[in-house]
Protein backbone atom coordinates (compact mmCIF):
# COMPACT_ATOMS: atom_id res chain seq x y z
CA UNK A 1 0.00 0.00 0.00
CA UNK A 2 1.36 3.42 -0.95
CA UNK A 3 1.07 5.68 2.08
CA UNK A 4 2.91 8.69 0.70
CA UNK A 5 0.14 11.28 0.92
CA UNK A 6 2.08 14.09 -0.72
CA UNK A 7 3.05 12.12 -3.81
CA UNK A 8 -0.44 10.67 -4.08
CA UNK A 9 -2.00 14.14 -3.95
CA UNK A 10 0.33 15.15 -6.75
CA UNK A 11 -0.80 12.21 -8.87
CA UNK A 12 -4.41 12.94 -7.98
CA UNK A 13 -4.11 16.54 -9.11
CA UNK A 14 -2.28 15.62 -12.30
CA UNK A 15 -4.78 12.94 -13.24
CA UNK A 16 -7.73 15.21 -12.53
CA UNK A 17 -6.48 18.20 -14.49
CA UNK A 18 -7.81 17.30 -17.92
CA UNK A 19 -11.06 15.80 -16.68
CA UNK A 20 -11.78 18.75 -14.42
CA UNK A 21 -11.16 21.25 -17.20
CA UNK A 22 -13.61 19.45 -19.44
CA UNK A 23 -16.23 19.18 -16.73
CA UNK A 24 -15.93 22.78 -15.58
CA UNK A 25 -15.67 24.66 -18.82
CA UNK A 26 -14.59 27.69 -16.70
CA UNK A 27 -12.23 28.54 -13.84
CA UNK A 28 -13.17 26.76 -10.62
CA UNK A 29 -13.09 29.85 -8.43
CA UNK A 30 -13.74 33.55 -8.52
CA UNK A 31 -13.57 36.40 -6.07
CA UNK A 32 -16.57 36.51 -3.73
CA UNK A 33 -19.03 39.32 -4.35
CA UNK A 34 -18.92 42.34 -2.10
CA UNK A 35 -22.40 41.67 -0.70
CA UNK A 36 -23.04 39.00 1.90
CA UNK A 37 -25.47 36.46 0.51
CA UNK A 38 -28.21 34.75 2.47
CA UNK A 39 -28.60 31.16 1.31
CA UNK A 40 -31.24 28.54 2.05
CA UNK A 41 -30.29 24.88 1.58
CA UNK A 42 -32.69 21.95 1.14
CA UNK A 43 -31.19 18.46 1.18
CA UNK A 44 -32.50 15.11 0.01
CA UNK A 45 -32.17 14.02 3.65
CA UNK A 46 -34.39 16.73 5.18
CA UNK A 47 -32.81 16.77 8.65
CA UNK A 48 -29.31 15.78 7.46
CA UNK A 49 -27.38 18.82 8.70
CA UNK A 50 -24.13 16.87 8.38
CA UNK A 51 -24.14 17.71 4.67
CA UNK A 52 -24.09 21.47 5.35
CA UNK A 53 -21.75 21.44 8.37
CA UNK A 54 -18.50 21.33 6.32
CA UNK A 55 -19.50 24.63 4.69
CA UNK A 56 -19.95 26.66 7.87
CA UNK A 57 -16.34 27.77 8.28
CA UNK A 58 -16.08 29.15 4.74
CA UNK A 59 -19.50 30.79 5.04
CA UNK A 60 -18.45 32.46 8.31
CA UNK A 61 -15.19 33.63 6.74
CA UNK A 62 -17.18 35.41 4.03
CA UNK A 63 -19.90 36.68 6.33
CA UNK A 64 -22.53 34.58 4.55
CA UNK A 65 -25.62 33.26 6.28
CA UNK A 66 -26.51 29.63 5.53
CA UNK A 67 -29.81 28.23 6.75
CA UNK A 68 -30.89 24.63 6.21
CA UNK A 69 -34.58 24.12 5.56
CA UNK A 70 -36.17 21.35 7.64
CA UNK A 71 -39.78 20.11 7.89
CA UNK A 72 -39.72 20.72 11.66
CA UNK A 73 -37.23 20.77 14.53
CA UNK A 74 -38.01 17.27 15.84
CA UNK A 75 -34.82 15.63 14.56
CA UNK A 76 -32.38 18.49 15.19
CA UNK A 77 -29.97 17.68 18.01
CA UNK A 78 -29.41 20.29 20.72
CA UNK A 79 -26.31 22.29 19.94
CA UNK A 80 -26.24 21.44 16.23
CA UNK A 81 -24.13 24.23 14.72
CA UNK A 82 -26.08 24.36 11.45
CA UNK A 83 -28.76 27.09 11.49
CA UNK A 84 -32.13 25.58 10.57
CA UNK A 85 -35.62 26.86 9.84
CA UNK A 86 -38.88 25.58 8.46
CA UNK A 87 -40.03 27.10 5.17
CA UNK A 88 -42.70 29.05 7.04
CA UNK A 89 -40.13 30.59 9.39
CA UNK A 90 -37.17 30.91 7.02
CA UNK A 91 -35.30 34.22 6.91
CA UNK A 92 -35.18 36.37 3.80
CA UNK A 93 -32.78 34.88 1.28
CA UNK A 94 -31.00 35.55 -2.00
CA UNK A 95 -30.58 31.95 -3.17
CA UNK A 96 -32.01 28.47 -2.69
CA UNK A 97 -29.64 25.51 -3.04
CA UNK A 98 -31.03 22.00 -3.44
CA UNK A 99 -28.79 18.96 -3.10
CA UNK A 100 -30.96 16.78 -5.30
CA UNK A 101 -34.42 16.34 -6.77
CA UNK A 102 -35.98 14.39 -3.92
CA UNK A 103 -39.36 15.30 -2.49
CA UNK A 104 -38.11 17.71 0.17
CA UNK A 105 -35.88 19.80 -2.13
CA UNK A 106 -38.63 19.86 -4.76
CA UNK A 107 -41.19 20.95 -2.16
CA UNK A 108 -38.88 23.73 -0.99
CA UNK A 109 -38.25 24.86 -4.56
CA UNK A 110 -41.99 25.09 -5.13
CA UNK A 111 -42.42 27.07 -1.91
CA UNK A 112 -39.63 29.53 -2.77
CA UNK A 113 -40.49 29.75 -6.44
CA UNK A 114 -39.09 33.28 -6.89
CA UNK A 115 -35.62 32.57 -5.51
CA UNK A 116 -32.71 31.81 -7.84
CA UNK A 117 -32.04 28.07 -7.73
CA UNK A 118 -28.80 26.04 -7.76
CA UNK A 119 -28.36 22.26 -7.52
CA UNK A 120 -25.25 21.06 -5.66
CA UNK A 121 -24.55 17.40 -5.07
CA UNK A 122 -23.19 16.92 -1.53
CA UNK A 123 -23.72 13.14 -1.42
CA UNK A 124 -24.01 10.37 -3.97
CA UNK A 125 -27.11 9.90 -6.12
CA UNK A 126 -28.38 6.93 -8.05
CA UNK A 127 -27.77 7.56 -11.77
CA UNK A 128 -31.49 7.44 -12.55
CA UNK A 129 -33.72 10.47 -13.15
CA UNK A 130 -35.66 11.46 -10.03
CA UNK A 131 -39.45 11.61 -10.50
CA UNK A 132 -39.57 15.34 -9.69
CA UNK A 133 -36.42 16.43 -11.51
CA UNK A 134 -38.40 18.20 -14.23
CA UNK A 135 -39.81 20.60 -11.62
CA UNK A 136 -36.31 21.94 -11.01
CA UNK A 137 -34.50 21.83 -14.34
CA UNK A 138 -35.81 25.03 -15.97
CA UNK A 139 -35.02 27.11 -12.89
CA UNK A 140 -31.47 25.94 -12.28
CA UNK A 141 -28.92 28.71 -12.70
CA UNK A 142 -26.02 26.33 -12.18
CA UNK A 143 -25.20 22.79 -11.11
CA UNK A 144 -22.19 21.61 -9.10
CA UNK A 145 -20.82 18.30 -7.94
CA UNK A 146 -17.79 17.02 -6.06
CA UNK A 147 -16.09 14.99 -8.79
CA UNK A 148 -16.29 14.06 -12.47
CA UNK A 149 -17.78 10.67 -11.58
CA UNK A 150 -20.33 12.20 -9.26
CA UNK A 151 -21.26 14.76 -11.92
CA UNK A 152 -22.19 11.97 -14.33
CA UNK A 153 -24.49 10.36 -11.77
CA UNK A 154 -25.95 13.75 -10.76
CA UNK A 155 -26.69 14.62 -14.38
CA UNK A 156 -28.74 11.46 -14.73
CA UNK A 157 -30.46 12.13 -11.39
CA UNK A 158 -31.51 15.56 -12.67
CA UNK A 159 -32.21 14.36 -16.21
CA UNK A 160 -29.96 17.01 -17.74
CA UNK A 161 -27.11 17.30 -20.24
CA UNK A 162 -26.04 20.71 -18.99
CA UNK A 163 -22.43 21.28 -17.92
CA UNK A 164 -21.81 20.57 -14.24
CA UNK A 165 -19.12 22.47 -12.36
CA UNK A 166 -16.79 20.13 -10.46
CA UNK A 167 -15.74 21.79 -7.20
CA UNK A 168 -14.48 18.93 -5.01
CA UNK A 169 -15.78 17.86 -1.62
CA UNK A 170 -15.47 20.31 1.30
CA UNK A 171 -14.69 17.27 3.45
CA UNK A 172 -11.32 16.97 1.69
CA UNK A 173 -10.29 20.57 2.38
CA UNK A 174 -8.31 19.55 5.45
CA UNK A 175 -7.28 15.93 4.91
CA UNK A 176 -5.42 14.43 7.87
CA UNK A 177 -1.89 13.05 7.40
CA UNK A 178 -2.04 9.27 7.20
CA UNK A 179 -0.44 7.48 10.14
CA UNK A 180 -1.74 3.89 10.01
CA UNK A 181 -1.67 1.87 13.21
CA UNK A 182 -0.78 -1.81 13.05
CA UNK A 183 -3.79 -4.12 12.65
CA UNK A 184 -6.34 -1.30 12.95
CA UNK A 185 -9.35 -1.70 10.63
CA UNK A 186 -11.92 1.07 10.23
CA UNK A 187 -15.45 -0.26 9.77
CA UNK A 188 -17.61 2.19 7.80
CA UNK A 189 -21.30 1.70 8.48
CA UNK A 190 -24.27 2.81 6.46
CA UNK A 191 -27.80 3.18 7.85
CA UNK A 192 -29.58 0.01 8.96
CA UNK A 193 -33.07 1.40 9.55
CA UNK A 194 -34.68 4.03 7.28
CA UNK A 195 -36.27 7.03 8.96
CA UNK A 196 -37.88 10.32 8.06
CA UNK A 197 -34.49 11.81 7.24
CA UNK A 198 -33.54 9.24 4.63
CA UNK A 199 -33.35 5.66 3.47
CA UNK A 200 -31.14 2.75 4.44
CA UNK A 201 -28.62 0.55 2.68
CA UNK A 202 -28.62 -3.24 2.93
CA UNK A 203 -25.55 -5.03 4.20
CA UNK A 204 -25.35 -4.41 7.94
CA UNK A 205 -25.49 -8.13 8.79
CA UNK A 206 -22.64 -8.82 6.37
CA UNK A 207 -20.61 -5.94 7.80
CA UNK A 208 -21.21 -7.04 11.40
CA UNK A 209 -20.18 -10.59 10.56
CA UNK A 210 -17.08 -9.33 8.73
CA UNK A 211 -16.09 -7.22 11.73
CA UNK A 212 -16.44 -10.29 13.96
CA UNK A 213 -14.21 -12.34 11.65
CA UNK A 214 -11.57 -9.63 11.56
CA UNK A 215 -11.63 -9.17 15.34
CA UNK A 216 -11.24 -12.93 15.79
CA UNK A 217 -8.21 -12.79 13.47
CA UNK A 218 -6.54 -10.24 15.74
CA UNK A 219 -7.57 -6.99 14.08
CA UNK A 220 -8.53 -3.98 16.16
CA UNK A 221 -11.90 -2.63 15.07
CA UNK A 222 -12.68 1.09 14.99
CA UNK A 223 -16.19 1.98 13.83
CA UNK A 224 -16.88 5.02 11.68
CA UNK A 225 -20.57 5.48 12.40
CA UNK A 226 -22.89 7.02 9.82
CA UNK A 227 -24.67 9.97 11.46
CA UNK A 228 -28.02 8.16 11.22
CA UNK A 229 -26.85 4.65 12.11
CA UNK A 230 -28.12 2.80 15.20
CA UNK A 231 -25.21 3.12 17.61
CA UNK A 232 -26.32 0.16 19.72
CA UNK A 233 -25.49 -2.26 16.89
CA UNK A 234 -21.80 -1.37 17.16
CA UNK A 235 -21.19 -0.70 20.84
CA UNK A 236 -19.14 -3.88 21.28
CA UNK A 237 -16.35 -2.07 19.38
CA UNK A 238 -14.61 1.27 19.74
CA UNK A 239 -16.67 3.94 18.00
CA UNK A 240 -14.73 6.84 16.56
CA UNK A 241 -15.37 10.20 18.17
CA UNK A 242 -14.10 12.02 15.08
CA UNK A 243 -15.52 11.97 11.52
CA UNK A 244 -14.80 8.86 9.48
CA UNK A 245 -12.50 10.69 7.05
CA UNK A 246 -10.34 11.82 9.98
CA UNK A 247 -10.45 8.38 11.61
CA UNK A 248 -9.38 6.69 8.38
CA UNK A 249 -5.90 8.18 8.70
CA UNK A 250 -5.25 5.78 11.60
CA UNK A 251 -6.43 2.64 9.82
CA UNK A 252 -4.45 0.19 7.72
CA UNK A 253 -7.62 -0.64 5.78
CA UNK A 254 -11.26 0.46 5.82
CA UNK A 255 -14.09 -2.04 5.37
CA UNK A 256 -17.67 -0.97 4.87
CA UNK A 257 -20.84 -0.52 2.88
CA UNK A 258 -19.91 1.70 -0.10
CA UNK A 259 -21.22 5.24 0.26
CA UNK A 260 -20.33 8.90 -0.14
CA UNK A 261 -17.42 8.66 2.30
CA UNK A 262 -15.58 5.97 0.32
CA UNK A 263 -13.78 8.23 -2.20
CA UNK A 264 -12.89 10.61 0.64
CA UNK A 265 -11.28 7.82 2.66
CA UNK A 266 -9.36 6.75 -0.44
CA UNK A 267 -8.16 10.35 -0.82
CA UNK A 268 -6.60 10.09 2.65
CA UNK A 269 -4.65 7.09 1.36
CA UNK A 270 -6.49 4.29 3.13
CA UNK A 271 -7.42 1.25 0.99
CA UNK A 272 -11.05 0.13 1.00
CA UNK A 273 -12.87 -3.18 0.97
CA UNK A 274 -16.56 -2.97 0.08
CA UNK A 275 -19.17 -5.17 1.76
CA UNK A 276 -21.75 -5.59 -0.97
CA UNK A 277 -25.11 -7.14 -0.23
CA UNK A 278 -26.90 -8.47 -3.35
CA UNK A 279 -29.64 -5.89 -2.77
CA UNK A 280 -27.23 -2.93 -2.60
CA UNK A 281 -27.39 -0.45 -5.47
CA UNK A 282 -24.77 2.29 -5.63
CA UNK A 283 -23.07 4.17 -8.48
CA UNK A 284 -20.18 2.30 -10.08
CA UNK A 285 -17.59 4.88 -9.03
CA UNK A 286 -18.13 4.01 -5.35
CA UNK A 287 -17.22 0.42 -6.15
CA UNK A 288 -14.32 1.47 -8.38
CA UNK A 289 -12.40 2.96 -5.44
CA UNK A 290 -12.58 -0.36 -3.57
CA UNK A 291 -9.59 -2.69 -3.68
CA UNK A 292 -12.13 -5.52 -3.74
CA UNK A 293 -15.70 -6.26 -2.74
CA UNK A 294 -16.93 -9.16 -0.63
CA UNK A 295 -20.29 -10.85 -0.29
CA UNK A 296 -19.36 -13.27 2.48
CA UNK A 297 -17.77 -12.53 5.85
CA UNK A 298 -15.36 -15.40 5.32
CA UNK A 299 -13.69 -13.36 2.58
CA UNK A 300 -12.95 -10.38 4.83
CA UNK A 301 -9.56 -11.39 6.23
CA UNK A 302 -7.99 -12.13 2.84
CA UNK A 303 -9.51 -9.00 1.30
CA UNK A 304 -8.06 -6.82 4.06
CA UNK A 305 -4.65 -8.48 3.77
CA UNK A 306 -4.47 -7.72 0.05
CA UNK A 307 -6.09 -4.28 0.05
CA UNK A 308 -4.53 -1.56 -2.11
CA UNK A 309 -5.46 1.87 -3.40
CA UNK A 310 -7.05 2.31 -6.85
CA UNK A 311 -5.14 3.71 -9.79
CA UNK A 312 -4.60 7.50 -9.63
CA UNK A 313 -6.93 8.16 -12.56
CA UNK A 314 -9.74 6.20 -10.89
CA UNK A 315 -9.15 8.05 -7.64
CA UNK A 316 -9.15 11.46 -9.31
CA UNK A 317 -12.37 10.68 -11.17
CA UNK A 318 -14.15 9.69 -7.95
CA UNK A 319 -12.67 12.26 -5.54
CA UNK A 320 -12.42 15.46 -7.56
CA UNK A 321 -10.05 18.34 -6.76
CA UNK A 322 -8.64 18.31 -3.23
CA UNK A 323 -8.28 21.53 -1.24
CA UNK A 324 -10.29 24.74 -1.52
CA UNK A 325 -13.54 22.93 -2.31
CA UNK A 326 -15.78 24.91 0.07
CA UNK A 327 -14.39 28.10 -1.47
CA UNK A 328 -15.09 26.88 -5.01
CA UNK A 329 -18.60 25.79 -4.06
CA UNK A 330 -19.55 29.11 -2.49
CA UNK A 331 -17.97 30.92 -5.43
CA UNK A 332 -20.30 28.96 -7.72
CA UNK A 333 -23.28 29.87 -5.56
CA UNK A 334 -22.25 33.52 -5.57
CA UNK A 335 -22.33 33.61 -9.38
CA UNK A 336 -25.98 32.52 -9.32
CA UNK A 337 -27.09 35.44 -7.13
CA UNK A 338 -28.24 38.61 -8.93
CA UNK A 339 -25.81 41.49 -8.47
CA UNK A 340 -28.55 43.71 -7.07
CA UNK A 341 -31.11 42.59 -4.49
Positions of PLM-derived features:
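N-terminal export signals
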Residues: 2-6, 10-30
Amino acid sequence: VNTNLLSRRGLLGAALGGAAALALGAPASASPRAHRPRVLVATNEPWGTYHVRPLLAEAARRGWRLTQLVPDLSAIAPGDPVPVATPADAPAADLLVVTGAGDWPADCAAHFRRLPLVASSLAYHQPVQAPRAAELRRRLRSITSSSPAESRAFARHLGTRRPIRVVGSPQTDDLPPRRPEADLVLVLTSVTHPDGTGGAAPGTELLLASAEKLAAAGKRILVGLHPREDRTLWERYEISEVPSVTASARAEVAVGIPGTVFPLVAAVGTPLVGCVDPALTVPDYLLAVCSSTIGDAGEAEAAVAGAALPEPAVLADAVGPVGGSARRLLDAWSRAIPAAH
